[in-house]
């Protein structure tokens, strides 16, 4: 017959160690990420739609980065995977590129004011698919994708020029970008303005992939661009 062991006193400190270690380890979680979405916003549209929030002057004359966001095909997109801050850029060239290509349009054109915006993007999105020590790699990847894909040049080469008074066919804009990048993007519109262009890439950011549910469908309420025609201010 098995003997029943007497209860031994447990040192409270040993329990404390067991509890603290997981909390420290889990301050950053790398989530499953099937692909990344490069979200490019048109500054003039942003400011027309959000006139009270827009503080940038002068406005950039090219698409700027809203974010590089992880997503999944069959499950909810991961968000807010860390509470840790990213390290400030030590390379002034990188910071200058960030100010030009990834500015906070809600802030004035003063160096350093976009850091909170970048911090939010890192905590909410970048930290879910890049390790904590690779925050700079995350930002550099977004900059590289924006320069390589160059949506404004694609549109201008096909006579979609910003500032043109007449609206453009949403389907034509969609097809033009699709042909140029070889995959389907997502167009986002508001108040009949072209607000954002989303291009999807694999989870390494190496190759462009099709964005799910991307083809425009005029007038459905939940479509990201529910218009037949759109203005490109």
UniProtKB/Swiss-Prot annotation:
> Where is carbohydrate linked to this protein?
62, 72
Main localization, broad class: secreted
Q: Name one Pfam family in it.
A: Ribonuclease_T2
Which cysteine pairs make disulfide bonds? 47-54, 81-128, 189-225, 200-211
Tell me which positions the record assigns to the signal sequence: 1-31
* Gene Ontology cellular-component annotations: extracellular region
> Which of this chain's residues are annotated to bind RNA?
41, 66, 104-105, 117, 124-125
- The active site is formed by 66, 121, 125
Tell me where in or outside the cell this protein is found.
Answer: Secreted, Extracellular space
Extract the SUPFAM superfamilies matched here. Ribonuclease Rh-like
InterPro entries noted in UniProt: Ribonuclease_T2_eukaryotic, RNase_T2-like, RNase_T2-like_sf, RNase_T2_His_AS_1, RNase_T2_His_AS_2
Catalytic reaction equation(s)? a ribonucleotidyl-ribonucleotide-RNA + H2O = a 3'-end 3'-phospho-ribonucleotide-RNA + a 5'-end dephospho-ribonucleoside-RNA + H(+)
Family annotation (CDD domains) = RNase_T2_euk (cd01061)
Listed EC numbers = 4.6.1.19
Q: What class of enzyme is it?
A: lyase
Q: Which GO terms describe its biological process?
A: RNA catabolic process
Could you tell me the keywords of this UniProt record? Answer: Disulfide bond, Endonuclease, Glycoprotein, Hydrolase, Lyase, Nuclease, Secreted, Signal
Q: Where is this region: Disordered?
A: 211-233
Q: Name one GO molecular function term.
A: RNA binding
Q: Which family does it belong to?
A: Belongs to the RNase T2 family.
Job description of the protein: Self-incompatibility (SI) is the inherited ability of a flowering plant to prevent self-fertilization by discriminating between self and non-self pollen during pollination. In many species, self-incompatibility is controlled by the single, multiallelic locus S.
Q: What protein name applies here?
A: Ribonuclease S-4
Which organism's genome codes for this protein? Antirrhinum hispanicum (Snapdragon)
- GN (gene name): S4
